[in-house]
Amino acid sequence: ASDVYKRQIFDCGPKITIEHKFQYLPYYSKNIWPDKIPLFEKSIMEFYNLCSQISISILKQIEISLNYSTNFFADKFNLPMALLRCNYYPKRSKELTDNDFGIAPHTDYGCLTLLFTDGTPGLEVELPSKKWEPVTAKKNEIIINFGDMLEIWSDQKIRATPHKVIGTNKERFSIPFFFNPQYDTIICDEKNLVAGEYLSQRYDETYVHKII
C-alpha cells in the first residue's frame, strides 16, 4: 500500500516591506491571513521573528563549534527563505498500519528547523544504528533538526536529521519553523550551488505543482 499522509497546514513566510529583486519568487510571496481572527497576524509574526532570532543564535554556536569565521552562516539571512508552518494531525479512527504516516521518513531540504509540539508523541528520528527512536518534548521545549542544505554548507560536518511522524489515535499539533538563507547564498563554492535554486530543485523533484 502507498504511504498515507494525513494533516492540515497553515503556512506563512517573511513579511517583506521593501522592494527587492526576490519579491516575486515563491519563497517571498505575500502572506494571506484569515480576516476573522483578531490579532492572528500580529501574534504569528511576533513568534516568527522570535524563531528567526533563536535560529541565528544556534547558527552562531555552530560557527564556533566548527571553528568557522564569525558570520560564516549568520550574515546570510538578511532576507531569509524562512517558513513557519502550523500542522494539525487528526486522530485516526481505523487500525493503524506500518505505512500510516503523518509524514513519511525524510530529511528536511533546508538549513535548520525548529520544532514546537503539544507534547503528543508521534515524532521519531533515525539513529546512526538505523534504529528509529521516539522523540518526546514538553510544550516549552524546542526540537532542532538539521537539514540537507546545512549538511552541504558545512561540508558534511553537520548531518541532516532523518525523521518521520507516526500516525496515532490522538490528535497532534506541531509548529515547525524552517530557516533557510537568502535566495542567492552560495552554499557550495565548488559546485557554485545557490540556496534558492537548490531548494527549488528539491521541491520540483518531490511535488507536482498544480493550479486548481
Predicted regions and their residues:
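Catalytic core of Fe(II)/2-oxoglutarate
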Residues: 72-73, 82, 87-88, 98-100, ...
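Active-site-adjacent structural patch at catalytic or cofactor/ligand-binding sites
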Residues: 12, 25-29, 108, 143-144
